[in-house]
């Protein structure tokens, strides 16, 4: 069944003022998909369902440069990354020479790579750290950015990853760089740029270094930046971010890629299990719940695979550990959302939403064609039994989480959004190309 969700008018009633009360830290959002890795907020979170430029905007802060990385949040601080072009422009710009390159932005200026810390209450910049300065070797796809990988934090240190331009450990209080790592220069497929975000568990930081040359997974000591282990792999570029889950009393690092999906032992890098079935362009990241993991791709072939991790060993392709799979309406850029046993995912990067029982793979309702949402690069998030989906054109649809989801609101902001939303307590944070927005109600403090 396909039906159309029609936009309706959200009338602005009042102009919101800056919030001078306390933004409660009901939860942190320490990585690009939150503390669960699934894009979900705790049940205590209850952000607004309606907003506009004149309604429920507590503050918005102008951002320098460009970045599609998601903000991460710890208590009263928000952290984000940005790439800032500067200096004289090269004329003509330097084109990408990657095989098969298309729709890429040629590089015309040097860039500074910044980390910015913003006060969650006021939106004021607390500190800004310049991590690196260089003339990028790739411009990347025209829809991307030079700062697309999201940082991750444990509250004491922030780990900001700029791919070929370095990994930086930064003191959250002062902005001081503690250590840095240079992994070399990536050669991404078609020169489309970099974007896999790091994952953190305990003292171990995981980096996906898949590209067109020698690919590898790095496990680093978060205190020193030194290798704990390195697993070399025969993989092409994948933009998928690692997911760390606990299964059979073992922490597994799960990474989706073209040749194989693999689960690595977090302690030593040993491959626990592997499975084929992904495409040549893997962008979406996995989600997991109750010992199951869900992985999707959509270009150049469509696939969505559900895997039971319990007892999985060796090559599990075509075994009973593959619970179900589909090649219909699978995700490309936005990752799936896994919320209370339901899998929400968008077709390619378009406004066609599938709602599926995660365990069985059976359609729960829909699919739904959302006419108002055209290009969607950000991944859906969920809070308080509602789903939030934001398009690049600045429109967010809020949908109820129930057996038959209903549209609750269509909210428009005058900015372009590729970064995924972050949720902290009763507040939603949207990072646009020009501004960072704090969305909340004055009554909820």
What does each model-found stretch correspond to?
Residues 1-9, 16:
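Bacterial N-terminal signal peptides that target proteins for export
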Residues 11-13, 19, 23:
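Cleavable N-terminal signal peptides
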Residues 21-445:
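Noncatalytic, solvent-exposed loop/strand surfaces
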């Amino acid at each position: 069944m396909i039906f159309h969700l029609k936009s309706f008018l959200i009338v602005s009633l009042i102009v919101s003022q800056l919030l001078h009360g306390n933004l409660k830290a009901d939860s942190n959002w320490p990585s690009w998909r939150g503390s669960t890795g699934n894009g979900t907020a705790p049940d205590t979170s209850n952000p607004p369902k309606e907003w506009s430029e004149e309604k429920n905007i507590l503050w918005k802060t102008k951002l320098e440069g460009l970045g599609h990385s998601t903000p991460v949040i710890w208590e009263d601080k928000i952290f984000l990354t940005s790439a800032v072009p500067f200096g004289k422009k090269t004329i003509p710009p330097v084109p990408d020479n990657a095989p098969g390159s298309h729709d890429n932005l040629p590089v015309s200026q040097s860039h500074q790579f910044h980390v910015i810390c913003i006060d969650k209450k006021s939106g004021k910049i607390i500190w800004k750290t310049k991590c690196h300065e260089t003339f990028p070797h790739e411009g990347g796809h025209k829809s991307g950015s030079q700062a697309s990988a999201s940082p991750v934090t444990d509250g004491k240190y922030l780990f900001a990853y700029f791919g070929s331009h370095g990994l930086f450990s930064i003191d959250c209080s002062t902005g001081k760089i503690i250590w840095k790592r240079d992994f070399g220069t990536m050669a991404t497929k078609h020169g489309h740029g970099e974007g896999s975000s790091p994952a953190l568990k305990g003292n171990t930081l995981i980096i996906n270094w898949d590209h067109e040359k020698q690919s590898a997974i790095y496990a680093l000591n978060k205190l020193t930046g030194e290798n704990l282990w390195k697993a070399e792999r025969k993989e092409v570029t994948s933009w998928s971010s690692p997911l760390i889950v606990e299964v059979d009393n073992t922490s597994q690092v799960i990474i989706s890629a073209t040749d194989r999906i693999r689960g690595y032992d977090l302690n030593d890098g040993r491959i626990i299990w592997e499975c084929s079935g992904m495409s040549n362009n893997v962008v979406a990241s996995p989600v997991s719940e109750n010992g199951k993991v869900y992985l999707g791709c959509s270009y150049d072939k469509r696939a969505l695979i559900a895997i039971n991790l319990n007892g999985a060993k060796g090559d599990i392709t075509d075994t009973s550990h593959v619970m179900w799979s589909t090649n219909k309406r699978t995700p490309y850029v936005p990752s799936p959302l896994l919320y209370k046993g339901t899998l929400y995912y968008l077709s390619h990067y378009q406004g066609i939403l599938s709602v599926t029982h995660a365990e069985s793979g059976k359609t729960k309702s829909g699919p739904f064609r959302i006419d108002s949402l055209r290009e969607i690069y950000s991944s859906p998030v969920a809070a308080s039994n509602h789903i939030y989906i934001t398009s690049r054109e600045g429109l967010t649809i809020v949908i109820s989480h129930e057996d038959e989801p209903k549209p609750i609101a269509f909210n428009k902001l005058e900015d372009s959004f590729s970064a995924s939303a972050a949720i902290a307590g009763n507040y939603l944070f949207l990072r646009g190309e020009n501004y960072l927005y704090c969305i909340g109600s004055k009554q909820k403090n």
